[in-house]
Amino acid sequence: TEAYRTMNAELEILGVKLKHYRVDAAMEIAEEYLSNDKLNTIGIVTMQMLMQASKEPTWKQYIEDLDLTVIGETEVLEAAGIDPETPSYEEVETNEFIARFFWGLIQTKSRIFVLGDTEEELQTLQKYLTETYPGIEIGGGAVVETLEESAFDSLVNEINSQTTDVIVSGLAGTRQDRFVLENSSKISAKIWLSLGEHSTLQNEAG
């Protein structure tokens, strides 16, 4: 389709390969993910994450394996040498993908499940979502305190029992890559959205 041709480029930043799509194309892809029958991963990528990935091979692998990468800061575009006059800069500055994605979830009546590293983070993220996107349906949430397999299993069961469509993860770094890499085949949700180290959202939420 025409939208797919608007992909800006395959980028390489600090040795990490990323595909960069304009928001219209990224939204088309996300809508497709909601209708297929497997768990697809979408990640918001920041400079901090890329710097971490340049030092940690598993984290680099996680970012490169994401089904859809969404650039979360204009600094990433700058590092990739993308012209500041391109529309991508405004899309990134205004977090346009995030906004359109969540409004889309309200329209499709999709259920989300929120993950956080601490109870405070979890509540902050849930509060941010309900206040920013009135009508969004949060089926549940959980704090991921441990990487033990038994804890993962009970969490996967909880996510699946809520008939979750989208998992919104505020988890830091290696916690979430381990969780997704090891459990994706067991999770019945459609999309894993990793907010990562997305400072703008965290600041707005805080």
Regions found by a protein language model. Name each.
Residues 4-90:
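N-terminal nucleotide/polyanion-binding subdomain common to many enzyme families
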Residues 163-173, 189:
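Proline-aspartate-enriched helix->loop->beta-strand connector
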Residues 68, 111, 165-166, 191:
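Structural motif
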Residues 76-78, 175, 198-203:
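Short gly/pro/ser/thr-enriched loop/turn and capping motifs at secondary-structure boundaries
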Residues 47-50, 171-176, 198:
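Short glycine-rich anion-binding loops that position phosphate/pyrophosphate groups of nucleotides
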Residues 76-158, 162:
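Conserved beta-alpha
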Residues 143-147, 188-206:
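Short, flexible loop segments at boundaries between secondary-structure elements
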Residues 126, 177-186:
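Short Gly/Thr/Asp-enriched flexible loops that form oxyanion-binding sites at enzyme active sites
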